[in-house]
Regions:
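Flexible helix-coil linker/hinge segments at domain or subdomain boundaries
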Residues: 54-58, 100-110
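Short, compositionally biased low-complexity segments
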Residues: 14-21, 67-73, 165-174
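Active-site lining segments that contact anionic ligands and/or coordinate catalytic metals
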Residues: 20-28, 63-67, 106-108, 143, ...
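A glycine-rich phosphate-binding loop feature that marks nucleotide/adenosyl-phosphate handling sites
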Residues: 28-31, 59-75, 111-126
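Gly/lys/ser-thr-rich phosphate-binding loops in alpha/beta enzymes
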Residues: 89-102
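Radical SAM enzyme core and accessory elements
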Residues: 96, 105-175
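Conserved non-cysteine loop/helix-boundary elements of the Radical SAM core domain that shape
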Residues: 1-59, 80-91
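Metal-dependent DNA phosphodiester-chemistry modules and their immediately adjacent helices/loops
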Residues: 12, 66, 98-99
Length: 175
């Protein structure tokens, strides 16, 4: 988003100096050209935010909550990356594990990641065509309702609908 690291850290210093005790950092995994070094850079940045808290907070007894959240890159039409493929779920999970392991020892840093199944389905429909209309109808006829709510989401229902319509989700998400 064109935000310099120093600008982010200065904002954290200002917030911590003013008594704030929590920061949430959001990132996307799986962007084109991303490397393991980039993924580990997220952990490094979170640690730098923690250092800002240590340097600036007037009352360390309260503690600090730094939350790092990641989602899986979904290529969308009319964006700079519309023609780039979504990385396979196994690669996304490997990167999640890499970051989780890098943050494991940092008690003040919590790591959350987005469910890969919903992101995969989002990529399919973001890059889909008219053939997916039949998939939508089939999934709906088989009980898909309120699927953006995690308690109602059934990934297998959607995969069954794709299969019943003779379509492969990877064709849309990973091409």
């Amino acid at each position: 988003k064109n935000l310099r690291e120093e600008d982010l850290l200065q904002s954290c210093r200002t917030a911590f100096s003013g008594g704030w005790s929590g920061v949430k950092l959001y990132f996307m995994l799986g962007l084109p050209t991303e490397t393991d070094e980039d993924v580990l850079g997220i952990a490094d940045l979170a640690r730098k935010v923690y250092q800002c808290w240590r340097e600036c907070t007037p009352n360390r007894a309260r503690g600090v909550r730094i939350t790092v959240s990641t989602s899986w890159f979904v290529p969308k039409p009319h964006t700079a990356f519309q023609w780039d493929a979504q990385i396979p779920v196994e690669e996304y999970q490997r990167r999640v594990n890499l970051l989780r392991d890098a943050l494991k020892r940092d008690r003040s840093i919590t790591y959350n990641w987005h469910d890969p199944q919903t992101s995969y389905l989002e990529a399919i429909f973001s890059r889909g065509d008219r053939r997916l209309a039949d998939v939508l109808e089939h999934a709906w006829q088989n009980g898909a309702k309120f699927d953006s709510w995690s308690e109602y989401f059934d990934f297998h229902r959607w995969m069954d609908a794709l299969s019943a319509c003779g379509l492969d989700g990877d064709f849309y998400a990973h091409r």
